[in-house]
Amino acid sequence: MLKTRQCLLGIRTFLGVTSRIWSFFLYILRKHLRTIIQYQTVRYDILPLSPISRNRLNAVKRKILVLDLDETLIHSHHDGVLRPTVRPGTPPDFILKVVIDKHPVRFFVHKRPHVDFFLEVVSQWYELVVFTASMEIYGSAVADKLDNNRGILKRRYYRQHCTLDLGSYIKDLSVVHSDLSSIVILDNSPGAYRSHPDNAIPIKSWFSDPSDTALLNLLPMLDALRFTSDVRSVLSRNLHQHRLW
């Protein structure tokens, strides 16, 4: 009887140790997988267009892609403010020093994963326009960093170009171009494009997730959308009501 109890105790101890070792192994594996995903080489092959596709593209107007900044392409926080979504000690991609109301403020800016690659690809398909509800002194500095002397983010609109309605800033796309059939807006805030929901592609807000792939997931759709004669024929299908990316 005593030997049986000792045997059972030994088995329980062995299983307990094995379980802890396995849990630790899984923790290390997940940690390394996140690192691999974060720094993996990204490709989106742009194949030559067929004659039919080329003719189709030549028959329609070149589209405009309007891009929001905060929580769409980047996330930032300023001196003394660290949102719980940003892991303490996470280094920013760049730091901006701006003067607001005569007070110097430092912004610590984190770029959404794959944003540089995303901009490089979509700039070949669309005219890119920045439209942010942020102040110009901040938004312009962020856009300069994302542009990185490539000349792809030349047109920019800021808070003064928005309409203030019930405490929210609304982006009027007719300010960008009068022909709304050729304008697409990518914004994490549905309220910002509520005047033009049929021109919008929704995207989930981004704060700190290093494994986020929302921008990459959008590339096939944006690639196809440029061939349409009116983007609203596709985007009007209630995409703004769903968090697809």
From Swiss-Prot:
**Record's subcellular location:** Endoplasmic reticulum membrane; Nucleus membrane
Species: Danio rerio (Zebrafish)
Q: What class of enzyme is it?
A: hydrolase
Which taxonomic lineage is given here? Eukaryota, Metazoa, Chordata, Craniata, Vertebrata
Membrane topology reported for the UniProt record: Single-pass membrane protein
Catalysis performed (reactions): O-phospho-L-seryl-[protein] + H2O = L-seryl-[protein] + phosphate; O-phospho-L-threonyl-[protein] + H2O = L-threonyl-[protein] + phosphate
Query: Principal localization?
Result: endoplasmic reticulum
Q: What is this protein called?
A: CTD nuclear envelope phosphatase 1A
Keywords, ordered alphabetically: Endoplasmic reticulum, Hydrolase, Membrane, Nucleus, Protein phosphatase, Transmembrane, Transmembrane helix
InterPro entries annotated for this entry? Dullard_phosphatase, FCP1_dom, HAD-like_sf, HAD_sf, TIM50
* E.C. numbers: 3.1.3.16
**GO CC term (a single one):** Nem1-Spo7 phosphatase complex
